[in-house]
């Protein structure tokens, strides 16, 4: 059966190029949309999402083969709406030119930075949060005054069609265009000469996107992933840490780029934490097999990948504990698992898990835990559980990650006034809030001179007394 997103090969490059050209022409005709116009775009987007939420919920549920409506509301629609409202409240301040200081030697003059739209922005959206990870960057790009092309994931065809229909009702194609299609379409999309390209997805695909963009010298923002660690301190109540880690790990069945990937636990507390985690998970989900609150794995390929991680770990000596051993698995709902006695030779400790499998790693000293993290690629998120402010400061100072959440998981991503982005292999650049506006804007430096031109006193021919005075005052 042909995918509903499939496009005839002959049309891929032609259609994309035509859409891009139409947006480029529209931008050339209106290169600096006023605040009122941008606010109307944002308002229209917000109202359309609210009006069309049920269709989006049903489409996402269909794509996952079981996704809680409440999870979609809380993890996709709510942050999308809140992000739009945040941009609406602050847009005029963000657009205001920023006055800058002019050095004494260059007076009289004034300096300012003005924020201009870049032009046509490309956004490549992943499958795990097909709404939020489209609307979040779209909000920043529209707030900055750009035209936008979105490439939606072929792994979530129902969601892609629903979001495309919604956006087509709100925006003309030369303002916001939604592109559907398989891998070949995505590859062609990444080769378009965008003024900025934002990609969210796997690290190895991010490398390919960056290589494609480099051919056009297109700047990129890459939101990737990695193995985001959680550290449980020696003093934090285990029930508290376990409950919050369980929520972060099981939301969307762990298919979250900032989900805690593994947990570092004081050696003497390892078994107690495992027990607390089991209890916390069972409180959240008394059962998983027929529980509409618990999301399914997106497709058979991802389910098989996760099963292979379990099989590999078990074969190499890990203790693998299914937290729901008595249930008959139905569909693609994979129960949460705990893994102990893990080591670096296991694939589960090398790859981003992206599922409800949680390895536990013992440590004896906090610096040992930090060294373990720092010896590995820099993660997208880091979580620390402990109320000692000295230890909190130590963790912040001696670790690198895209973002940090102290005493909870995931929630830093939902803060509209905090930037979201990775570091190193987990990504580059930021969006959300003001940082999103800046990412999709050109900060243009403007210096304005007055009629009096003191600078002419240092023009050639050189060797004048005033030039020697300037050297003495400023550089010698």
Give the location of each predicted region.
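Conserved C-terminal structural/oligomerization subdomain of aldehyde/semialdehyde dehydrogenase
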Residues: 2-3, 10, 34, 326, ...
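ALDH superfamily catalytic-core signature
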Residues: 10, 171, 204-343, 366, ...
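Residue-level signal for inorganic ion chemistry
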Residues: 38, 84, 145, 176, ...
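Rossmann-like NAD(P) dinucleotide-binding subdomain of oxidoreductase/dehydrogenase enzymes
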Residues: 104-240
